[in-house]
Regions:
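"…together with the soluble PPM/PP2C metallo-phosphatase catalytic core" -> "…together
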Residues: 1-229
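C-terminal membrane-associated helical module and adjoining short loops/tails
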Residues: 1-3, 211-309
Length: 309
C-alpha cells in the first residue's frame, strides 16, 4: 500500500518542478504589497498540485471500477480549480467567479445528498460552503499555514473516510510543504491551491455529516472558523469593507506586527486544530462544544491582550 503513496510523492515532485518552469516563464509571481505578509516576489500557484493529484486519483479510481470518488466530484474540482488558477494569473470578474463557485457547490450538494433535506438546508449549505471556501482562501496568508493546517484537516478526514483515498491528497500537501514551510518560501499555494483544498475538504465534511447525521464534523475547521468569523465581526464593528484585502487576522498580526516566524504561527494553528480535531473524532457533540468554547476564549484573550479590538 505504501508503494502507491511513494509513487504519488514522486509524481507530485515532478508536477511541482514542471510548474515552477511554467510559472517562471509566464511570470506567475506574487509581488509584495502593503496587504501581504511577504517581502520578496514569490512564485504563485504551487497549490495547483492539490487538484491535479486528486483529480488523477479520482479518474484512475473510476477507470478501475472504484466509484467512491465520482466523476461529478472530479468535475466540481476541475471547475473550481480552473477558475481559481485563472484568478491567479489574470484579472477575473467577480461575477464569473461566483457563478463557477455556485455551480461547483451545486455539484457538491447533489453528490453528497444534501439536496434531500429541502430548500432551506440547501440554501444554508450553499452559503456556508461558499463562505468556508473563501475563508480558507483568506487564511492562506503566511508561509506554512495552508500546508500545516491542511495536513491536520485532511489527515483527520483520511482517517474517517478511507474510501475517499485522501492519503494521496495528503501526500500532495506534504510535497507542497517542502517548498512552502520555510522562512523564505519557494512558492505560494495561490487561489488554485487553497480554494481547491477547501472545496475537497468541504465535500468530505458534508459527506461525513450526511452519513453520520452529526453536525460535529464542521468543527474539523474550527480554528480557521474562529479566526475568520471573529475577524469579520471586528471589521464590521469598525465599519470596514469586509471584502477588501486586509491584515487584521490574528495570525497576520502575530507574523507581521509581533514578528513571530511564519512557521511558528502556522504550527500554533495546526496544533490547535489537531487538539480540537481529536475531540471531534473521539468525543460527543457536547465535548466538542466545550473544546471549541475553550479555543474561542483563548483566542479572544490573546486578541484582547494584543489590543486587536
Amino acid at each position: 500500500m505504501l508503494f502507491k503513496e511513494i509513487i504519488s510523492f514522486g509524481i507530485g515532485i515532478l508536477i511541482i518542478q514542471l510548474y515552477f518552469i511554467v510559472a517562471k516563464h509566464f511570470g506567475i509571481i506574487d509581488k509584495p504589497s502593503d496587504r501581504s505578509s511577504h517581502v520578496v516576489p514569490t512564485l504563485r500557484g504551487g497549490g495547483i498540485l492539490f487538484p491535479l493529484i486528486y483529480m488523477l486519483v479520482g479518474i484512475t479510481s473510476v477507470y478501475f471500477g472504484y466509484h467512491a470518488i465520482s466523476l461529478w466530484f472530479v468535475l466540481g474540482i476541475f471547475l473550481i480549480a480552473t477558475i481559481s488558477f485563472w484568478d491567479d494569473v489574470a484579472t477575473l470578474s467577480p461575477k464569473i467567479r461566483v457563478i463557477v463557485h455556485v455551480l461547483s457547490v451545486a455539484i457538491l450538494i447533489w453528490q453528497t445528498g444534501i439536496y434531500e433535506y429541502g430548500f432551506l438546508i440547501v440554501l444554508l449549505s450553499i452559503i456556508l460552503i461558499i463562505g468556508s471556501i473563501n475563508a480558507y482562501n483568506f487564511m492562506d496568508g503566511i508561509n506554512g499555514i495552508t500546508a500545516l493546517y491542511s495536513m491536520v484537516v485532511v489527515g483527520s478526514l483520511t482517517y474517517k473516510l478511507p474510501e475517499m483515498r485522501l492519503q494521496y491528497l495528503l501526500v500532495a500537501i506534504i510535497v507542497f510543504a517542502i517548498y512552502n514551510v520555510r522562512k523564505k518560501a519557494v512558492c505560494f499555494s495561490g487561489d488554485v491551491g487553497s480554494v481547491s483544498l477547501a472545496y475537497i475538504i468541504a465535500f468530505c465534511i458534508a459527506k461525513l455529516m450526511v452519513n453520520t447525521q452529526e453536525i460535529k464534523w464542521i468543527f474539523l475547521l474550527g480554528i480557521y472558523g474562529i479566526d475568520s468569523i471573529v475577524t469579520i465581526l471586528y471589521r464590521l464593528k469598525r465599519k470596514e469593507n469586509i471584502f477588501k484585502p486586509h491584515r487584521t487576522h490574528l495570525y497576520q498580526y502575530l507574523a507581521n506586527e509581533k514578528g513571530m516566524s511564519h512557521v511558528s504561527v502556522s504550527l500554533i494553528y495546526a496544533v490547535a486544530q489537531a487538539l480540537l480535531s481529536y475531540v471531534v473524532i473521539t468525543g460527543n457533540f457536547v465535548n466538542v462544544l466545550i473544546a471549541f468554547g475553550i479555543a474561542l476564549v483563548i483566542y479572544l484573550a490573546v486578541r484582547l491582550k494584543l489590543g486587536l479590538d
